[in-house]
């Protein structure tokens, strides 16, 4: 779900291997300046991202976070923008298939 600047990314059924792993997940989110807030609902976490505030570093971190915690990476297509195109659409990048070739 998106509007002009805010995007809601969904983390469904995230599996943590320990309490510290769970804490690390939320600390990681807290370090990202483009993440405005997050809210849990049942087994889903809604992550509110200010897409306009997302820079390359933030997008790289979201890619790593989503990969590490096995969150559906297809929703990161919202960052497929001209300013990131030179590296975001790199077919050899570890995220490419999960974002652009994954079944919907």
For each predicted feature, which ranges?
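Short, ordered beta-strand-loop transition motifs
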Residues: 1-3, 39-43
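Short, hydrophobic beta-strand segments
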Residues: 4-11
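Short, surface-exposed ligand-recognition loops at beta-strand->loop->(often short) alpha-helix junctions
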Residues: 11-21
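Conserved strand-to-helix beginnings and helix N-cap segments that scaffold or border functional pockets
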Residues: 19-23, 56-59
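Histidine-anchored nucleotide/phosphate-binding helix
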Residues: 25-27
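Short acidic amphipathic segments
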Residues: 29-39
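A generic structural motif
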Residues: 43-52
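Helix-rich interaction surfaces within compact, conserved domain-sized segments
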Residues: 51-104
């Amino acid at each position: 779900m998106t509007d002009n600047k805010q995007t809601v990314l969904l983390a469904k059924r995230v599996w943590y291997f320990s309490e510290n792993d769970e804490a690390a997940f939320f600390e990681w989110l807290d370090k990202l300046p483009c993440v405005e807030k997050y809210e849990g609902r049942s087994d889903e976490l809604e992550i509110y991202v200010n897409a306009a505030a997302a820079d390359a570093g933030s997008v790289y971190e979201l890619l790593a976070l989503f990969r590490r915690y096995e969150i559906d990476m297809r929703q990161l297509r919202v960052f497929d923008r001209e300013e990131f195109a030179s590296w975001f659409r790199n077919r050899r990048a570890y995220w490419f298939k999960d974002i652009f070739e994954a079944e919907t």
